[in-house]
């Protein structure tokens, strides 16, 4: 799998925005910033870490992954499944910042 295809989009929710700002504003010795992104379904933690190293030139300290199963919805009285998707929460130490709009 190409590393450019691993990271799809940033997840913009209230909780993901709180994870970014809480880590950046911490008063402890190490500042940990967490970014939430939507990744390819077949990507694993090591591929996600390598993709961040290559694309954004920063090394993540940890990667947490969650898989979401697509729900079955109805369209014109027929069941139509939504696709499965995967979310990754990537943690950086020392307040590393990423600009997703610049790298797109």
From Swiss-Prot:
| This protein's UniProt keywords | Ribonucleoprotein, Ribosomal protein, RNA-binding, rRNA-binding
A Pfam family per the record: Ribosomal_L23
GO BP, one annotated term: translation
The terms under GO molecular function for this entry are:
rRNA binding; structural constituent of ribosome
Q: What does this protein do?
A: One of the early assembly proteins it binds 23S rRNA. One of the proteins that surrounds the polypeptide exit tunnel on the outside of the ribosome. Forms the main docking site for trigger factor binding to the ribosome.
Quaternary structure, per UniProt, is: Part of the 50S ribosomal subunit. Contacts protein L29, and trigger factor when it is bound to the ribosome.
Protein name per the record = Large ribosomal subunit protein uL23
Query: Which species is this record about?
Result: Leptospira borgpetersenii serovar Hardjo-bovis (strain JB197)
Q: Which gene encodes it?
A: rplW
